[in-house]
Amino acid sequence: AQQDLEAWKLSCHEQISQLEQSVQQFSSVLDHNDVMSLDMAQDYDKLHLSNPWFNEYYREEQSKLFIKALKVRKQFLYENRKNVMAAAKIWDSQNKYIERKNIIEAAWGWINLTIPVISSTFASFSRMCKNLGVNTIGHLFIDEAGQAVPQASVGAIFRSHNVMVVGDPSQIKPVLTMDSNILNMLREHFGVTEKYLSNSASTQTLTDCASRYGFYKEEDRSDRSWIGIPLWVHRRCLDPMFTISNRISYNGFMVQGNPGNGKTGWFDVKGKANDKYVKEQGEFLLKKIKKMIEENPAIIDKKAKDIIYVISPFTNVAYMLSQKLKGIGFTRFDDHGKPTNVGTIHTFQGKEAPIVFMVLGADQQSAGAARWAVSEPNMMNVAATRAKKEFYIVGDKKLYLNCGGDVITETYEVISKYKKQYPELIDDDVNSVMEYNNDITRIEGVIADVKRGKRAKYAEVTGYDNKTYTIDENIFSQTINAENIISKGNHISFVIKSQG
């Protein structure tokens, strides 16, 4: 036994010696290149902004390896193209193999090898993968998991060998179709805690609870303050949007990865609300955006990316604004006729634009709705962090500040402090906008017909305001590429001069 012990100790010493030599060799290599090691002595911000054990050379070699791996896979798939084609046929005819699901799973393996990354919603996943068994999917990545109710992800997680969940419970919560009182009754009946069944429970919150690695965001180190691995560096917004978000939602832990100063302001517009929509706020926003369009016509260029988002906590406010702004060619629609740049805060999760207007709506008669809108930081956090460069609030300042609570108070404090520091970056002058007037009106519509005139063609346009306009022969002949642009059925945007 003594000999065995001595032999084991000698073996351990040899292993330690080998490891020490490896460390020395590695240290020698590090001394002669620009690879930065992890330095825990750095201050908080620098530590999070650092990128240890990585450099440009590593990135290039990583990319080369990836390209070579793709070539190997391409050749393998070419050599086995008959199997790939057979797998596609099996996948399209799953009902024939319902009693032999191992064949369906084998077909999935070939399909997933051919298409390594397959994107789906949970609703589509339940139909697409209903015949797959446990651990048949190698890696599952769930994005925006803070919005997903836990039960929606069960089937996908059950079928996956590895799961990575990405989300932020501090942003939009899951949308529930069931009243919170019913949730309380179900929770009591089945004896489960709020962690599993409540209006704040999500795939992200449950994954955070199950994660062995994470972070206590509160000093009390309670279970409720435990979150998964936080990515604290924020690279989207300039200040003060970053500061608003960091203060109301993240206890100051976020690190600014996009330094610089943006513009902000609170336009104090009051009025009587009809289902939370305040006509005066709509009129103000119409004139404000109209003025901005004249300064930058790209705002309504449908081929360009969105420059401005208009968002609101309330559905009716968003709808009324989308209709009002449609008249100046601002509102954009998808193929189903749904506005894409005007909507509720919930519809803009994950999106971004240089400029965001948050229209609060409500009046004293709907003060309860106003309190709800700012009762928790989630919606203000999402609204502020949609804006990359400029963030403006439109609403009754007195009404909302009287709602109380940390969210609106701290948001206002950040904007007020920013105003003192950078007065040139503040835009909150309501009067100059309301007094602004010109004789230019921009209309959006559809070309109803193109006809031949005496000297050139002319066109009749049906505006979205249901009025009929004419593009006369002079304008038609002066328009570059007119035959393609001014064609029947095309959507166009144009300006008209009022006649006094």
Where do the language-model regions lie?
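Conserved helicase/translocase motor-coupling segment
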Residues: 246-326
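Short, charged beta-turn/beta-strand-edge "cap" motif at the junction between a beta-strand
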Residues: 361-362, 495-500
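Structural motif
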Residues: 118-119, 141, 164-166, 311, ...
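ASCE P-loop NTPase helicase motor core
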Residues: 90-91, 96-248
